UniProtKB/Swiss-Prot annotation:
Expressed by the venom gland. It is found in: Secreted. Residues 23-48 form a propeptide. Disulfide bonds join 52-66, 56-77, 71-82. Postsynaptic neurotoxin. It comes from Cyriopagopus hainanus. One of its GO terms (molecular function) is toxin activity. Belongs to the neurotoxin 12 (Hwtx-2) family. 02 (Hwtx-2) subfamily. Keywords: Disulfide bond, Neurotoxin, Postsynaptic neurotoxin, Secreted, Signal, Toxin. The keyword Secreted applies. PROSITE patterns: HWTX_2. This is U4-theraphotoxin-Hhn1i.
Length: 85
């Protein structure tokens, strides 16, 4: 009984991991296709740049030095821009 339960749980875990990995691979392959517009990625980059610049400008107006904003997703604020770390 225990062996059967362990086998079922193991198979379920492998299936979930395989499905997740397959979805990630499919998403990466779609992003890497030649000729596919990168408008969605460009929009995200522009949004991060805008958020960071606005944050720094607000801090400067308050007579404070511009502190690094915590940009999300592996990005970091430098020179009023979010740059990839």
């Amino acid at each position: 009984m225990k062996v059967t339960l362990i086998a079922i749980l193991t198979c379920a875990a492998v299936l979930v991991l395989h499905t997740t990995a397959a979805e990630e691979l499919e998403a990466e392959s779609q992003l890497m296709e030649v000729g596919m517009p990168d408008t969605e990625l460009a929009a995200v980059d522009e949004e991060r740049l805008f958020e960071c610049s606005v944050s720094c400008e607000i801090e400067k107006e308050g007579n404070k030095d511009c502190k690094e904003k915590k940009c999300k997703g592996g990005w970091k604020c430098k020179f009023n821009m979010c740059v990839k770390v």
